[in-house]
């Protein structure tokens, strides 16, 4: 039975309802600082912690509850006679419920405030109390989440107590929260790209219907620390998002944000199937559609500019899963909403990934993000590319780095008219891309050419300019082939494998 509760919260949502309920049930309430004042002002009987400890708050409130009369009351095991005799002899009364939420370090660390101000939002007393309560969960109810208040109220109302399994779950939530909270603080203080222990806090945003396939379970988590495009998006229309939808959105949004020009990316199964620069959103969309008018069906479309009504009217002519853009005009949104299942996503932030994580069985791989396009732009052939070819080379390299390796993209006038990827050798995607992109003049490769066969195929298909990282022991073979056929070639020094 709960006889005494300690309440100390930063987020005061729902706390009056809980405190009033506890008071009506005859529970004595202890509190500190702002929470004490809030409860008092709302007519709820409350005792200040300093009255219990006989010790005033000190050090600008850094020390409030760090006292044996508080922690002894929380940690004493009720079925342990020695524990109970000890606290009785010390004049300590048991505390049966601890209601605490922490200083909002996750939010404050992002604000434009000084380092010292951010440090002040590292909570000490709160974590100490909730860890103590969680350790002694069989005797103490610990609440850290506003969303749990009603469940606890309901259980006490119906049975007079909180069920063991509920107390255990609430205790588990404490350590789950603390691992994220401490992980964020660790990242803030260490500023280490590869710390000894990897603590990257994520908070669940929603459960997903299923994972990559229907028999797999899944959930969507947002980074608790820092920003990110997939963290801050808004869904303006359509069915709930799936696991595959979110993965595809991420890649499509990254592709279009490689460019300053108006660019549209059509994407399917996590790989671009059409990318194009246009004079306006409609023009960019139509050109991306023409890159592969088959694969775009049932895919995702991303634009890096505000989508207007003409573009929206063209998009709704076919079945699309998702349209993602930085914003939509009001009339464009009305058109898109005419397709009730079409997911319309407003992306509020540009991509900001600096690191990538890859789960392997029993371990995690961490690497810096592939954010560097080229090391150099070295023309290695007798023939130099024209300005137009050079623009298409850069365009192609920006696209090919998002295609599964081995990857080849062929480009014509700012459009990826042929995309080949996901093959275990380089000649197959080259043939595939050139077959799809008849008439293309520029070829971009995510990695070096191991043999001269790519150049031979390029010549057969009318390619006039090639961009690739270089670095093969047979680079000269490819250079000689280009010189033989009058093809210009640029080497960048940067490989873009994507597995």
Curated annotation (Swiss-Prot):
UniProt catalytic activity:
(6R)-10-formyltetrahydrofolate + 5-amino-1-(5-phospho-beta-D-ribosyl)imidazole-4-carboxamide = 5-formamido-1-(5-phospho-D-ribosyl)imidazole-4-carboxamide + (6S)-5,6,7,8-tetrahydrofolate; IMP + H2O = 5-formamido-1-(5-phospho-D-ribosyl)imidazole-4-carboxamide
- Keyword flag ATP-binding: no
Look up the record and name the pathway of this protein.
Answer: Purine metabolism; IMP biosynthesis via de novo pathway; 5-formamido-1-(5-phospho-D-ribosyl)imidazole-4-carboxamide from 5-amino-1-(5-phospho-D-ribosyl)imidazole-4-carboxamide (10-formyl THF route): step 1/1; Purine metabolism; IMP biosynthesis via de novo pathway; IMP from 5-formamido-1-(5-phospho-D-ribosyl)imidazole-4-carboxamide: step 1/1
Q: What is its EC number?
A: 2.1.2.3, 3.5.4.10
What InterPro entries does the database record attribute to this sequence? AICAR_Tfase_dup_dom_sf, Cytidine_deaminase-like, MGS-like_dom, MGS-like_dom_sf, PurH-like
Bilayer-crossing residues are: none
Instruction: Report domain MGS-like positions.
Output: 1-144
Pfam families attached here? Answer: AICARFT_IMPCHas (PF01808), MGS (PF02142)
Q: Name one GO molecular function term.
A: phosphoribosylaminoimidazolecarboxamide formyltransferase activity
| Keywords noted in UniProt | Hydrolase, Multifunctional enzyme, Purine biosynthesis, Transferase
Coiled-coil positions: none
Query: Which superkingdom is the protein from?
Result: Bacteria
What protein family is recorded?
A: Belongs to the PurH family.
Which comment does the entry carry about domains? The IMP cyclohydrolase activity resides in the N-terminal region.
> Under which name does UniProt file this protein?
Bifunctional purine biosynthesis protein PurH
Per the UniProt record, the source organism is Clostridium acetobutylicum (strain ATCC 824 / DSM 792 / JCM 1419 / IAM 19013 / LMG 5710 / NBRC 13948 / NRRL B-527 / VKM B-1787 / 2291 / W)
Name the gene.
purH
């Amino acid at each position: 039975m709960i006889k005494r509760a300690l309440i100390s919260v930063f987020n005061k949502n729902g706390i009056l309802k809980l405190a009033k309920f506890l008071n009506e049930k005859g529970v004595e309430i202890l509190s500190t600082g702002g929470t004490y004042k809030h409860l008092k002002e709302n007519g709820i009987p409350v005792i200040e912690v300093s009255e219990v400890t006989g010790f005033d708050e000190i050090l600008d409130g850094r020390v409030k509850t760090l006292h044996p009369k508080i922690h002894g009351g929380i940690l004493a095991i009720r079925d342990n006679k020695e524990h109970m005799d000890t606290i009785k002899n010390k004049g300590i009364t048991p505390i049966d419920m601890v209601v605490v939420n922490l200083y909002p370090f996750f939010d404050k660390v992002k604000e434009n405030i000084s380092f010292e101000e951010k440090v002040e939002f590292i909570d000490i007393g709160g974590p100490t109390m909730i860890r103590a309560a969680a350790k002694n969960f069989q005797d103490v109810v610990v609440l850290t989440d506003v969303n749990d208040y009603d469940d606890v109220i309901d259980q006490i109302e119906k049975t007079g107590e909180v069920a063991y399994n509920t107390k255990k779950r609430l205790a588990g939530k404490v350590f789950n929260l603390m691992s994220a909270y401490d992980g964020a603080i660790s990242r803030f203080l260490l500023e280490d790209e590869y710390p000894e222990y990897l603590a990257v806090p994520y908070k669940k945003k929603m459960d997903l219907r299923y994972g990559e396939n229907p028999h797999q379970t899944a959930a969507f988590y947002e980074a608790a620390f820092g920003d990110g495009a997939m963290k801050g998006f808004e869904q303006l229309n359509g069915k709930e998002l799936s696991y595959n939808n979110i993965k595809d959105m991420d890649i499509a949004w990254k592709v279009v944000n490689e460019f300053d020009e108006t660019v549209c990316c059509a994407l399917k199964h996590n790989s671009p199937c059409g990318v194009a620069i246009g004079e306006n959103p409609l023009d960019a969309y139509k050109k991306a559609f023409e890159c592969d008018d088959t694969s775009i069906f049932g895919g995702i479309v991303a634009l890096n500019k505000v989508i207007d009504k003409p573009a929206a009217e063209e998009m709704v002519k076919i079945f699309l899963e998702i349209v993602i853009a930085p914003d939509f005009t009001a009339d464009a949104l009305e058109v898109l909403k005419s397709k009730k299942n079409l997911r319309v996503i407003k992306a509020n932030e540009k991509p900001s990934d600096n690191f990538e994580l890859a789960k392997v069985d029993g371990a995690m791989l961490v690497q810096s993000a592939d954010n560097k396009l080229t090391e150099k732009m070295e023309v290695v052939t007798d023939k130099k590319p024209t300005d137009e070819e050079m623009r298409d080379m850069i365009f192609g390299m920006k696209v090919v780095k998002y295609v599964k390796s081995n990857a080849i993209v062929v480009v014509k006038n700012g459009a990826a008219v042929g995309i080949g990827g996901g093959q275990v050798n380089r000649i197959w995607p080259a043939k595939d891309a050139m077959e799809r992109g008849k008439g293309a003049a520029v070829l971009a490769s995510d990695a070096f050419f191991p043999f001269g066969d790519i150049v031979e195929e390029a010549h057969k298909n009318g390619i006039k300019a090639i961009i690739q990282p270089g670095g093969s022991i047979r680079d000269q073979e490819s250079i000689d082939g280009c010189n033989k056929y009058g093809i210009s070639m640029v080497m960048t020094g940067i490989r873009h494998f994507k597995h």
